[in-house]
């Protein structure tokens, strides 16, 4: 067994050390630890994170462990071994998710589900999804060590391809469980020319059973997920725990502007129909309309494609994306219509044709009040300061909200950085989140069913 000092020295020079040193590189003062875990094994949890980070580790820093990649498969196989060693009944379901069940005293009670995902974005970090996954493993190990048998069965789940890198939509594994995967999605082809259904087969799933894999109504008590915040609110405020009130809804639109491509040197300024100029006005309009209303809604123009794309040709066609997020779907629907009307007027004034199509809409997923209550009480037991907050990023919990009550626990992301090799959460905060997950599950276990 390592001493605390030896363990910290190894961590400082290990796979997670590069992110850990970011604090000193940026000249920031280390903040006091406001939450101490006493029930879970903090060092074992951190070691599990370090071991997981080896799968897809990059020499330049960070991790690339794309869903349905060899590194993703290796990581899942490694965890399957850990779960079997912990005595769980382990399976790979039709969507290639890991499902590991621990029997309860009463099998007639619905199962308590908890977990996250282990895939990453390209050149991502070692904490997004991984904190929740390794904490779920640590919860099981802690229960085993303390000889605690819950009343309810426990179902640890690691969802496949949450990031959705190979294909257009994320949250694949959880959407499959919730019955939200359409048959045509299985035929989508990635950049290698491989269909999604082929990847599912290669990694132990069965695409033919995905349409029938949704658990029976009432068989899931609740779903609880621990995750890094992936934003800077907790970090800036120095608060170790976020109690998530809901995951925002998302509307994504494609705007197409058709102007007139022409010679950049011979066309007078007053005779131009420049689609890029109109696009610039629309981008500013999106920002102004989103910020003109009270609330926490956000809007982003994140992609823009200009044609013909030459320095001596007036842009004749522009396609851009507009994304709106808020806990109220009605608000972002109304905001989208305001943007549509404003953009149409701007385009008409410039003599540019305009169209705007909604391509994706994710409904907001509110967490269950009882689950939030018990997360809060678990934090109070540890004297951990909390902040009730919305999640601006999508998570598997929003798919599971279609099936059962859900809850989420956030831990801070240093400087709000995520999807980056510099993504980092301190060991003490990871352990604090894990113990609140553990305590909350035990509190929920006292309740037969949530109303």
Region annotations inferred by a language model:
Residues 245-247, 263, 267-293, 341, ...:
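His/Asp/Glu-rich mid-to-C-terminal helical/loop segments that flank catalytic regions of hydrolases
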Residues 37, 55-58, 115-116, 386-436, ...:
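Zn-dependent metallopeptidase/amidohydrolase metal-coordination segment
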Residues 57-103:
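A non-catalytic alpha/beta surface segment that caps or lines the substrate-entry region
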Residues 6-27:
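N-terminal export signals
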Residues 35, 161-162, 166-330:
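Midchain, well-structured core segments that form catalytic/ion-binding scaffolds
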């Amino acid at each position: 067994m390592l001493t605390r000092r030896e363990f910290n020295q190894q961590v400082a020079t290990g796979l997670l050390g590069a992110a850990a040193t970011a604090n000193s590189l940026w000249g920031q003062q280390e903040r006091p630890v406001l939450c101490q875990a006493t029930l879970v094994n903090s060092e074992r949890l951190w070691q599990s994170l370090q071991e997981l980070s080896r799968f897809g580790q990059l020499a330049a820093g960070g991790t690339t462990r794309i869903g349905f990649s060899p590194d993703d498969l290796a990581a899942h196989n490694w965890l399957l071994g850990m779960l079997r060693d912990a005595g769980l009944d382990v399976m790979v379901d039709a969507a290639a998710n890991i499902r590991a069940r621990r029997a309860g005293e009463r099998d007639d009670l619905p199962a308590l589900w908890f977990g996250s995902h282990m895939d990453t974005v390209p050149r991502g970090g070692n904490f997004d999804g991984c904190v929740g996954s390794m904490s779920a493993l640590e919860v099981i190990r802690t229960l085993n060590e303390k000889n605690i048998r819950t009343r309810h069965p426990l179902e640890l789940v690691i969802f496949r391809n949450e990031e959705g890198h190979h294909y257009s939509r994320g949250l694949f594994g959880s959407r499959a469980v919730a019955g939200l995967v359409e048959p045509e999605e299985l035929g989508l082809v990635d950049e290698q020319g491989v269909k999604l259904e082929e990847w599912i087969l290669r990694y132990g799933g069965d695409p033919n059973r995905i349409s029938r894999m949704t658990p029976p109504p009432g068989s899931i008590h609740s779903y609880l997920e621990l995750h890094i915040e992936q934003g800077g609110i907790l970090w800036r405020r120095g608060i170790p725990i976020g109690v998530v009130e809901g995951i925002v809804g998302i509307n994504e639109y494609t705007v197409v502007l058709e102007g007139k491509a022409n010679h950049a040197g011979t066309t007078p300024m007053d005779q131009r129909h420049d689609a890029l100029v109109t696009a610039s006005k629309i981008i500013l309009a999106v920002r102004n309309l989103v910020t003109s209303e009270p609330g926490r809604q956000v809007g982003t123009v994140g992609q823009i494609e200009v044609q013909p794309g030459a320095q001596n040709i007036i842009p004749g066609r522009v396609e851009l994306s507009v994304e709106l997020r808020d806990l109220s779907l009605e608000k972002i629907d109304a905001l989208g219509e305001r943007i549509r009307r404003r953009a149409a007027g701007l385009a008409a004034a410039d003599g540019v044709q305009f169209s705007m199509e909604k391509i994706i809409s994710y409904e907001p997923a509110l967490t269950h009040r009882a689950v939030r209550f018990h997360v809060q009480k678990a934090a109070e037991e540890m004297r951990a300061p909390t902040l009730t907050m919305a999640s601006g990023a999508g998570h598997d919990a929003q798919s599971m909200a279609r099936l059962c009550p859900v809850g989420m626990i956030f831990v801070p992301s240093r400087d709000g950085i995520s999807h980056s090799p510099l993504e980092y959460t301190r060991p003490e905060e990871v352990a604090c989140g894990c113990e609140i997950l553990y305590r909350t599950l035990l509190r929920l276990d006292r309740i037969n069913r949530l109303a």
